[in-house]
Amino acid sequence: CGGCEAGSAGKDAFHLRVRVHPFHVLRINKMLSCAGADRLQTGMRGAFGKPQGVCARVAIGQVLLSVRCKDGNANHAQEALRRAKFKFPRRQKIIVSRKWGFTKFSRTDYLKYKSENRIVPDGVNAKLLGCHGRLAARQPGRAFLEAVGN
């Protein structure tokens, strides 16, 4: 996903977020299958097992990867995700979000709030300034805002 995306759109043209991580440890209780093995092992007594690998526990419909990019690079991002989904088991879907980047605001709301100077950048997210807090800290003419309908 990253190599295809970086090759066509450039390395600074997208932001990839991996939403699931492999924290679940898979273990194996090795059993001997040779002659005299019954004298060496204890069966299921103390069968905790040794770590064999790790995996991610994923629910049906859970988001695995998220990519944000500019509208001009959207086709490159979709192609990269299409190639990447073959590396995952089962059937995967590519869904184009109606939100702005990784924020919780829709595109139209984000652009409206940005033109009103009500959006404050907060890392990869954005905060919406509401009508709470000290009046002295507000901009002139911005003391009382209409309620936000999310």
Swiss-Prot record:
Classification via Pfam families: Ribosomal_L16
Keywords: Ribonucleoprotein, Ribosomal protein
Classification via PROSITE patterns: RIBOSOMAL_L10E (PS01257)
SUPFAM superfamilies reported in the protein's UniProt record: Ribosomal protein L16p/L10e (SSF54686)
GO cellular component terms, A-Z: cytosolic large ribosomal subunit
GO biological process: translation
Recorded GO MF terms: structural constituent of ribosome
Gene3D superfamilies registered for this protein in UniProt: 3.30.60.300, Ribosomal protein L10e/L16
Residue intervals passing through the bilayer: none
Keyword Ribosomal protein found: yes
Known partners and oligomeric status: Component of the small ribosomal subunit. Mature ribosomes consist of a small (40S) and a large (60S) subunit. The 40S subunit contains about 33 different proteins and 1 molecule of RNA (18S). The 60S subunit contains about 49 different proteins and 3 molecules of RNA (25S, 5.8S and 5S).
Family: Belongs to the universal ribosomal protein uL16 family.
Descriptive protein name: Large ribosomal subunit protein uL16
Taxonomy of the source species: Eukaryota, Viridiplantae, Streptophyta, Embryophyta, Tracheophyta
Gene that specifies this protein: RPL10
